[in-house]
């Protein structure tokens, strides 16, 4: 049985190689008792080696969340100091070629998952005057090409967190939104096989799209450095509301704060070579007219 003075951190999405694993180890290093969650099919070897407490969880399944609460409550005697909503998935596709069912699945993980977690665990957080940490992204702020749906899920998470922060303040619970820049993880692995649909207006960009879904982010922040920053902020008595950390987060924060939103348009158009698409489209239109 853990002593009454023990603090507990519950982190979702702690598969090997991701941000969750790094967060778990950092909370452990800081003297917090971390509790990890894994998808039912994920290996626990990396957590077992570190002596981490873990439970299976599918954040899209109500019964799974309810069972997790029972298990965690039994372990912590009804207390929870940190709830870190980290579980997330990507969906990379052009906005007009989006498969809505795939996006609904992503929203179920990235947005409705945290909502389920807060709905079921809020009483334990209130009992401990705890903190909710929502892992967001610069994608929720900037028009990242081929990421419109993912961007939307992270924008929704951030702004849901804004209202959550105000509503929970009288109950003694803090809410911290992390605006994550590029971090070196394996989150893109499930997108490696994704291709543009046949007949897409973006077919001239097929090779660029393929390279994008197979990319290794340049100058990405090491996930353990990122975890150190995030955990450090969550341990503060009065953390900031939006905490920007990770590669490119500083410059994006500056531009987002002081410039019109269209400041990003030319940047991302150039970064993704959309001039090539325009040239191909213009040529195709001329051929139709001829």
Curated annotation (Swiss-Prot):
Signal peptide: none annotated. The chain crosses the membrane at residues 125-145. The active site is at residues 150, 154. Keywords: Glycoprotein, Membrane, NADP, Oxidoreductase, Transmembrane, Transmembrane helix. This is Short-chain dehydrogenase srdE. It is a single-pass membrane protein. It comes from Neurospora crassa (strain ATCC 24698 / 74-OR23-1A / CBS 708.71 / DSM 1257 / FGSC 987). Glycans are attached at residue 151. It comes from the Eukaryota. PANTHER family: NADPH-DEPENDENT 1-ACYLDIHYDROXYACETONE PHOSPHATE REDUCTASE, SHORT-CHAIN DEHYDROGENASE SRDE.
């Amino acid at each position: 049985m853990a002593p009454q003075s023990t603090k507990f951190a519950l982190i979702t999405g702690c598969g090997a190689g991701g941000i969750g694993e790094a967060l778990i180890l950092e909370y452990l290093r800081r003297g917090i008792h971390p509790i990890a969650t894994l998808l039912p099919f994920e290996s626990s070897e990396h957590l077992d080696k570190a002596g981490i407490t873990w439970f299976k969880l599918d954040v899209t399944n109500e019964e799974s969340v309810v069972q997790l609460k029972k298990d965690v409550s039994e372990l912590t005697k009804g207390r929870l100091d940190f709830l870190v909503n980290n579980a997330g998935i990507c969906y990379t596709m052009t906005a007009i070629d989006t498969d809505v069912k795939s996006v609904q699945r992503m929203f179920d993980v990235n947005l409705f998952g945290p909502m389920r977690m807060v709905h079921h665990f809020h009483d334990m957080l209130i009992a401990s005057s705890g903190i909710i940490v929502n892992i967001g992204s610069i994608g929720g702020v900037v028009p990242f090409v081929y990421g419109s749906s993912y961007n939307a899920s992270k924008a929704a998470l951030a702004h849901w967190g804004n209202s959550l922060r105000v509503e929970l303040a009288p109950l003694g619970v803090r809410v911290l939104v992390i605006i994550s820049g590029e971090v070196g993880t394996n989150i893109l692995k499930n997108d490696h096989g994704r291709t543009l649909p046949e007949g897409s207006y973006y077919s001239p960009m097929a090779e660029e799209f393929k390279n994008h879904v197979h990319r290794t982010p340049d100058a990405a922040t090491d996930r353990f450095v990122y975890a150190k920053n995030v955990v450090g902020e969550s341990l503060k008595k009065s953390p900031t509301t939006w905490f920007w950390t990770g590669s490119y987060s500083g410059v994006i924060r500056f531009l987002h704060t002081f410039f019109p939103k269209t400041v990003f348009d030319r940047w991302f158009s150039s970064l993704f070579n959309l001039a090539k698409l325009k040239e191909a489209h213009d040529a195709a239109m001329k051929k139709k007219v001829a």
